[in-house]
């Protein structure tokens, strides 16, 4: 059994005072990044079976996320002509999910090829948490945009311009970068509770509150009498989107932030408990990259039809080529809204019960 005083690979990269703190048995004060960078090795050494199981799960998440989000990126960038604010936010969300997935192979490479090297671990740790925070903020942007488009269509028209959406996306990336660096720079072992609470409120509880409030507002709007059938259906669709995002928040992001707050409040929590909780929470947050494609189905009315059109050929009636472009518009001659898919020289029509997305 190795001695508690033995030097570990990452200790060489830490100041002498930090190494001395480890040898004295106390928790050293160092940035959270240093802790995150070595937790993979600690889990593998302490619970090798759990480590192997989680690596299999992460590998599955990587493959599924790469396929689903790669397909979504192609559909929204190449097959969707109308770049509404929701589509703009969704494209950025897809990019963050792809980067989260791509960070997993980097994690394996660092663990097996550069174990204990803090410089090698920094890109993976920074990229992972940056994209997690971006996912939270872009999901919030999508929900706010859907609420404004459905419940406040006239008053919000000024704020739902493409230029405004692009500016919001730039701000989100910058804000996520600042929050990520702040989180990774928090000193553990000291009085870090206030800073951890502030960051948790800023980048998790506040977005969760926004989504919860807007979901309640749409539910109240649905209860109003006299709504037209089309208006009610569009509000139901928006509520389904908000509820889906709310579930993703609770399942994927709550465990990680709850663990961070718990460790800050109770620094003497058993080390093995904290270690397992961290890795389970990180796995659930990675699962977000596979759950977000559910959200895409509510962004535009034609997303599901477009995806089906890419995979299913219907004889001579449905033969897409590499140059095909899917377009959506509303027929003015029909008695009901019609969803028209223009695919090469062929045209398919189907009722668009939810109406065109604003």
Curated annotation (Swiss-Prot):
Tissue specificity as recorded in UniProt: Ubiquitous expressed with abundant expression in intestinal tissues.
Membrane-side (Extracellular) residue stretches: 1-46, 106-123, 189-195, 259-274
GO cellular component, as recorded: plasma membrane; receptor complex
Glycosylation: residue positions: 16, 24
InterPro entries: GPCR_Rhodpsn, GPCR_Rhodpsn_7TM
Single GO molecular function: G protein-coupled receptor activity
Localization, UniProt: Cell membrane
Listed transmembrane segments: 47-67, 85-105, 124-144, 167-188, 196-216, 238-258, 275-295
Keywords: Cell membrane, G-protein coupled receptor, Glycoprotein, Membrane, Receptor, Transducer, Transmembrane, Transmembrane helix
Cytoplasmic topological domain residue ranges: 68-84, 145-166, 217-237, 296-358
Topology with respect to the bilayer: Multi-pass membrane protein
Family: Belongs to the G-protein coupled receptor 1 family.
Its job: Orphan receptor with constitutive G(i) signaling activity that activate cyclic AMP.
PANTHER family for the chain: G-PROTEIN COUPLED RECEPTOR, G-PROTEIN COUPLED RECEPTOR 20
Name listed for the protein in its UniProt record: G-protein coupled receptor 20
């Amino acid at each position: 059994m190795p001695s508690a005083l033995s030097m570990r690979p990452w200790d060489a990269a830490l100041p002498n005072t930090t190494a001395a703190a480890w040898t004295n048995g106390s928790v050293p004060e160092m940035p959270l990044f240093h802790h995150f960078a070595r937790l993979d090795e600690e889990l593998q050494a302490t619970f090798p079976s759990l480590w192997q199981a989680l690596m299999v799960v992460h590998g599955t998440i990587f493959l599924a996320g790469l396929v689903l989000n790669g397909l979504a990126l192609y559909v929204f960038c190449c097959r969707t002509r109308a770049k509404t604010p929701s589509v703009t936010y969704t494209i950025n969300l897809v990019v963050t999910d792809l980067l989260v997935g791509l960070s997993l192979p980097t994690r394996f490479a660092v663990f097996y090829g550069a174990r204990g090297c803090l410089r090698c671990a920094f890109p993976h740790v920074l990229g992972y948490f940056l994209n997690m925070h971006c996912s939270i903020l872009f999901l919030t942007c999508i929900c706010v945009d859907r609420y404004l488009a459905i419940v406040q269509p006239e008053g919000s028209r000024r704020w739902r311009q493409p230029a405004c959406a692009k500016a919001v996306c730039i701000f989100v990336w910058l804000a996520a970068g600042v929050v990520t660096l702040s989180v990774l720079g928090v000193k553990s072992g000291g009085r870090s509770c206030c800073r951890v609470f502030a960051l948790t409120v800023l980048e998790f509880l506040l977005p969760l509150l926004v989504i919860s409030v807007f979901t309640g507002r749409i539910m109240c709007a649905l209860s109003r009498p006299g709504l037209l059938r089309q208006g009610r259906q569009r509000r139901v669709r928006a509520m389904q989107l908000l509820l889906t995002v709310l579930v993703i928040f609770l399942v994927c992001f709550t465990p990680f932030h709850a663990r961070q707050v718990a460790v800050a409040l109770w620094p003497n929590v058993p080390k093995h408990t904290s270690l397992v909780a961290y890795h389970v929470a990180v796995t659930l947050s990675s699962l977000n990259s596979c759950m977000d494609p559910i959200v895409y189905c509510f962004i535009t009315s034609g997303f599901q039809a477009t995806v089906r059109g890419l995979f299913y050929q219907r004889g001579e009636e449905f033969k897409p080529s590499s140059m095909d472009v899917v377009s959506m518009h509303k027929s003015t001659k029909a008695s009901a809204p019609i969803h028209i898919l223009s695919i090469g020289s062929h045209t398919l029509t189907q009722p668009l019960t939810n109406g065109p997305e604003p």
